[in-house]
Protein backbone atom coordinates (compact mmCIF):
# COMPACT_ATOMS: atom_id res chain seq x y z
CA UNK A 1 0.00 0.00 0.00
CA UNK A 2 1.26 3.43 -0.96
CA UNK A 3 0.18 6.81 0.40
CA UNK A 4 0.58 10.03 -1.56
CA UNK A 5 0.02 13.38 0.11
CA UNK A 6 -1.65 16.33 -1.57
CA UNK A 7 -3.17 19.72 -0.82
CA UNK A 8 -6.44 20.09 -2.73
CA UNK A 9 -7.32 23.78 -2.49
CA UNK A 10 -11.03 23.28 -3.14
CA UNK A 11 -11.36 20.59 -0.49
CA UNK A 12 -9.24 22.67 1.88
CA UNK A 13 -11.43 25.73 1.38
CA UNK A 14 -14.71 23.99 2.15
CA UNK A 15 -13.22 22.03 5.03
CA UNK A 16 -11.91 25.28 6.53
CA UNK A 17 -15.43 26.78 6.44
CA UNK A 18 -17.15 23.87 8.20
CA UNK A 19 -19.53 25.09 10.89
CA UNK A 20 -18.01 22.74 13.47
CA UNK A 21 -14.48 23.95 12.78
CA UNK A 22 -12.66 26.51 14.94
CA UNK A 23 -10.75 29.37 13.35
CA UNK A 24 -7.16 28.34 12.51
CA UNK A 25 -6.12 31.91 13.35
CA UNK A 26 -8.15 34.97 14.46
CA UNK A 27 -8.08 36.72 11.07
CA UNK A 28 -9.98 33.86 9.41
CA UNK A 29 -13.22 35.21 10.87
CA UNK A 30 -12.82 38.31 8.67
CA UNK A 31 -13.22 36.19 5.53
CA UNK A 32 -16.26 34.45 6.97
CA UNK A 33 -17.87 37.82 7.71
CA UNK A 34 -17.20 39.08 4.18
CA UNK A 35 -18.64 35.92 2.64
CA UNK A 36 -21.71 36.14 4.85
CA UNK A 37 -22.33 39.76 3.88
CA UNK A 38 -21.96 38.96 0.19
CA UNK A 39 -24.49 36.13 0.44
CA UNK A 40 -25.63 34.51 3.67
CA UNK A 41 -27.36 31.92 1.48
CA UNK A 42 -24.18 30.77 -0.27
CA UNK A 43 -22.19 30.96 2.94
CA UNK A 44 -24.71 28.65 4.65
CA UNK A 45 -24.17 26.12 1.87
CA UNK A 46 -20.40 26.44 2.09
CA UNK A 47 -20.32 25.92 5.85
CA UNK A 48 -22.38 22.74 5.56
CA UNK A 49 -25.81 24.02 6.63
CA UNK A 50 -27.78 24.10 3.36
CA UNK A 51 -31.09 23.29 5.04
CA UNK A 52 -31.11 26.70 6.74
CA UNK A 53 -31.54 28.30 3.31
CA UNK A 54 -34.77 26.42 2.61
CA UNK A 55 -36.98 27.29 5.54
CA UNK A 56 -39.42 29.01 3.19
CA UNK A 57 -42.56 27.12 2.17
CA UNK A 58 -43.61 29.46 -0.63
CA UNK A 59 -42.50 27.87 -3.92
CA UNK A 60 -41.84 31.22 -5.61
CA UNK A 61 -39.54 32.27 -2.77
CA UNK A 62 -37.74 28.95 -3.02
CA UNK A 63 -37.17 29.57 -6.73
CA UNK A 64 -35.76 33.00 -5.88
CA UNK A 65 -33.41 31.39 -3.39
CA UNK A 66 -32.14 29.00 -6.05
CA UNK A 67 -31.68 31.86 -8.51
CA UNK A 68 -29.72 33.87 -5.94
CA UNK A 69 -27.50 30.89 -5.22
CA UNK A 70 -26.70 30.34 -8.90
CA UNK A 71 -25.74 34.00 -9.33
CA UNK A 72 -23.62 34.40 -6.20
CA UNK A 73 -21.95 31.03 -5.65
CA UNK A 74 -18.94 31.78 -7.88
CA UNK A 75 -18.38 35.35 -6.56
CA UNK A 76 -18.44 34.12 -2.94
CA UNK A 77 -16.13 31.22 -3.77
CA UNK A 78 -13.67 33.58 -5.50
CA UNK A 79 -13.82 36.06 -2.62
CA UNK A 80 -12.69 33.37 -0.19
CA UNK A 81 -10.22 31.67 -2.53
CA UNK A 82 -8.43 34.94 -3.37
CA UNK A 83 -8.30 36.28 0.19
CA UNK A 84 -4.94 36.70 1.91
CA UNK A 85 -6.32 34.69 4.82
CA UNK A 86 -7.05 31.64 2.67
CA UNK A 87 -3.65 31.98 1.02
CA UNK A 88 -2.18 31.81 4.52
CA UNK A 89 -4.16 28.62 5.21
CA UNK A 90 -2.81 27.11 1.98
CA UNK A 91 0.76 28.08 2.84
CA UNK A 92 0.59 26.69 6.38
CA UNK A 93 -1.11 23.53 5.13
CA UNK A 94 1.65 22.94 2.59
CA UNK A 95 4.22 23.20 5.39
CA UNK A 96 2.19 20.74 7.44
CA UNK A 97 1.93 18.38 4.45
CA UNK A 98 5.72 18.14 4.33
CA UNK A 99 5.81 17.36 8.05
CA UNK A 100 3.23 14.56 7.68
CA UNK A 101 4.95 13.18 4.58
CA UNK A 102 8.30 13.03 6.37
CA UNK A 103 6.79 11.38 9.43
CA UNK A 104 4.96 8.76 7.36
CA UNK A 105 8.04 7.97 5.29
CA UNK A 106 10.00 7.42 8.50
CA UNK A 107 7.37 5.16 10.03
CA UNK A 108 5.60 3.50 7.10
CA UNK A 109 7.50 0.21 7.17
CA UNK A 110 6.79 -0.58 10.80
CA UNK A 111 3.26 0.83 10.54
CA UNK A 112 2.25 -1.25 7.52
CA UNK A 113 4.03 -4.37 8.79
CA UNK A 114 2.21 -4.03 12.11
CA UNK A 115 -1.15 -3.70 10.36
CA UNK A 116 -0.45 -6.79 8.25
CA UNK A 117 0.54 -8.76 11.34
CA UNK A 118 -2.56 -7.74 13.28
CA UNK A 119 -4.95 -8.19 10.37
CA UNK A 120 -3.41 -11.53 9.47
CA UNK A 121 -3.00 -10.87 5.75
CA UNK A 122 -1.14 -8.63 3.34
CA UNK A 123 -2.64 -5.21 2.73
CA UNK A 124 -4.13 -4.41 -0.68
CA UNK A 125 -1.65 -3.20 -3.28
CA UNK A 126 -3.25 0.14 -3.95
CA UNK A 127 -2.45 3.83 -3.77
CA UNK A 128 -4.31 5.97 -1.26
CA UNK A 129 -4.43 9.75 -1.67
CA UNK A 130 -4.23 11.71 1.57
CA UNK A 131 -5.75 15.19 1.28
CA UNK A 132 -4.02 17.30 3.90
CA UNK A 133 -5.92 20.05 5.70
CA UNK A 134 -4.78 22.68 8.20
CA UNK A 135 -3.57 21.05 11.44
CA UNK A 136 -5.69 23.34 13.62
CA UNK A 137 -8.83 22.30 11.75
CA UNK A 138 -9.19 18.73 12.94
CA UNK A 139 -9.82 16.18 10.22
CA UNK A 140 -9.63 12.42 10.00
CA UNK A 141 -11.86 10.67 7.51
CA UNK A 142 -11.83 7.78 5.06
CA UNK A 143 -14.08 8.53 2.09
CA UNK A 144 -16.26 5.50 1.53
CA UNK A 145 -15.77 3.87 -1.86
CA UNK A 146 -12.74 6.00 -2.69
CA UNK A 147 -9.05 5.51 -1.98
CA UNK A 148 -8.95 8.92 -0.32
CA UNK A 149 -8.28 9.99 3.26
CA UNK A 150 -8.76 13.50 4.63
CA UNK A 151 -6.26 14.35 7.37
CA UNK A 152 -5.22 17.30 9.50
CA UNK A 153 -4.54 17.51 13.25
CA UNK A 154 -2.04 18.94 15.68
CA UNK A 155 0.50 16.42 16.99
CA UNK A 156 -0.91 15.68 20.42
CA UNK A 157 1.88 13.17 20.99
CA UNK A 158 4.79 11.56 19.14
CA UNK A 159 3.90 9.94 15.79
CA UNK A 160 0.28 11.07 16.09
CA UNK A 161 -0.25 11.46 12.34
CA UNK A 162 1.18 8.02 11.54
CA UNK A 163 -1.12 6.34 14.04
CA UNK A 164 -4.25 8.00 12.75
CA UNK A 165 -3.40 7.55 9.09
CA UNK A 166 -3.17 3.85 9.96
CA UNK A 167 -6.52 4.19 11.74
CA UNK A 168 -8.15 5.55 8.58
CA UNK A 169 -6.51 2.85 6.45
CA UNK A 170 -8.03 0.24 8.75
CA UNK A 171 -11.55 1.62 8.24
CA UNK A 172 -11.15 0.72 4.58
CA UNK A 173 -9.67 -2.70 5.40
CA UNK A 174 -12.43 -3.59 7.88
CA UNK A 175 -15.13 -2.72 5.34
CA UNK A 176 -13.39 -4.93 2.77
CA UNK A 177 -13.05 -7.77 5.28
CA UNK A 178 -16.43 -7.57 7.02
CA UNK A 179 -18.78 -5.73 4.66
CA UNK A 180 -20.19 -2.21 4.74
CA UNK A 181 -22.51 -2.27 7.75
CA UNK A 182 -20.41 -4.58 9.93
CA UNK A 183 -17.16 -2.86 8.99
CA UNK A 184 -18.45 0.46 10.30
CA UNK A 185 -20.13 -0.58 13.55
CA UNK A 186 -18.99 0.04 17.11
CA UNK A 187 -17.21 -3.29 17.56
CA UNK A 188 -15.14 -2.98 14.38
CA UNK A 189 -14.30 0.63 15.26
CA UNK A 190 -13.23 -0.48 18.73
CA UNK A 191 -10.96 -3.13 17.19
CA UNK A 192 -9.43 -0.46 14.96
CA UNK A 193 -8.70 1.70 18.01
CA UNK A 194 -7.12 -1.19 19.90
CA UNK A 195 -5.01 -1.97 16.85
CA UNK A 196 -3.88 1.51 15.82
CA UNK A 197 -4.58 4.12 18.50
CA UNK A 198 -3.13 1.80 21.12
CA UNK A 199 -1.00 -1.16 19.96
CA UNK A 200 0.61 0.59 16.99
CA UNK A 201 1.20 3.78 19.00
CA UNK A 202 3.01 1.84 21.73
CA UNK A 203 5.15 -0.06 19.22
CA UNK A 204 6.10 3.08 17.29
CA UNK A 205 7.01 5.01 20.43
CA UNK A 206 8.56 2.07 22.29
CA UNK A 207 6.57 3.07 25.36
CA UNK A 208 3.10 3.87 26.60
CA UNK A 209 -0.02 2.10 27.77
CA UNK A 210 -3.49 1.47 26.45
CA UNK A 211 -6.04 4.29 26.47
CA UNK A 212 -3.72 7.10 27.64
CA UNK A 213 -0.80 9.10 26.26
CA UNK A 214 0.68 12.22 27.87
CA UNK A 215 -2.23 12.14 30.34
CA UNK A 216 -4.68 12.41 27.43
CA UNK A 217 -7.45 9.92 26.77
CA UNK A 218 -6.94 7.99 23.55
CA UNK A 219 -9.74 7.36 21.07
CA UNK A 220 -13.48 7.90 21.18
CA UNK A 221 -14.91 7.99 24.73
CA UNK A 222 -18.14 6.34 23.55
CA UNK A 223 -16.16 3.25 22.48
CA UNK A 224 -14.27 2.80 25.73
CA UNK A 225 -16.72 0.40 27.36
CA UNK A 226 -16.63 -1.90 24.32
CA UNK A 227 -12.84 -1.72 24.13
CA UNK A 228 -12.41 -2.66 27.77
CA UNK A 229 -14.79 -5.60 27.39
CA UNK A 230 -12.87 -7.05 24.44
CA UNK A 231 -9.40 -6.10 25.73
CA UNK A 232 -8.69 -9.49 27.42
CA UNK A 233 -9.55 -11.30 24.17
CA UNK A 234 -7.44 -8.79 22.25
CA UNK A 235 -4.42 -9.43 24.47
CA UNK A 236 -4.75 -13.16 23.78
CA UNK A 237 -5.13 -12.46 20.07
CA UNK A 238 -1.85 -10.53 20.06
CA UNK A 239 -0.02 -13.68 21.20
CA UNK A 240 -1.45 -15.87 18.45
CA UNK A 241 0.68 -16.74 15.44
CA UNK A 242 -2.25 -17.46 13.13
CA UNK A 243 -4.10 -14.16 13.43
CA UNK A 244 -7.20 -13.46 11.35
CA UNK A 245 -9.05 -10.26 12.16
CA UNK A 246 -12.31 -11.64 10.72
CA UNK A 247 -12.25 -14.53 13.20
CA UNK A 248 -11.43 -12.18 16.05
CA UNK A 249 -14.37 -9.97 15.12
CA UNK A 250 -16.74 -12.95 15.17
CA UNK A 251 -15.37 -14.06 18.53
CA UNK A 252 -15.96 -10.72 20.26
CA UNK A 253 -19.08 -9.59 18.41
CA UNK A 254 -21.39 -10.96 21.11
CA UNK A 255 -19.40 -9.82 24.14
Segments and roles (model prediction):
Residues 84-144, 202-210:
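Auxiliary, metal-adjacent structural segments of Zn-dependent hydrolase domains
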Residues 1-90, 94-95, 100-101:
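N-terminal low-structure segments adjacent to metalloprotease catalytic domains
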Residues 65-68, 72, 76, 99, ...:
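Charge-rich, solvent-exposed alpha-helical interaction surfaces
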Residues 1-30, 183-227:
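Post-HExxH zinc-binding segment in Zn-dependent metallohydrolases
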Residues 150-165:
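Short pre-active-site segment immediately N-terminal to the catalytic Zn-binding motif
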Residues 163-179:
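Active-site recognition of the HExxH zinc-binding catalytic motif
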Residues 205-255:
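Long, well-structured alpha-helical subdomains associated
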Residues 42-43, 131-134, 169:
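Alpha-helical, largely C-terminal catalytic domains
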Amino acid sequence: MKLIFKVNKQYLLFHSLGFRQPNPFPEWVNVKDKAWKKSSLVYSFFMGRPESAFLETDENKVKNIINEFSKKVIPVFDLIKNSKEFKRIVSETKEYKQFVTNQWNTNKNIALETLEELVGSTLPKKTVTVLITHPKLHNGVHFLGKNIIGWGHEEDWKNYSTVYLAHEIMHSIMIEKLGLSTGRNGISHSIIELMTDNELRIRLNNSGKYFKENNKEIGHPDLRSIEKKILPAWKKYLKKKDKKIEKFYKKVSNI
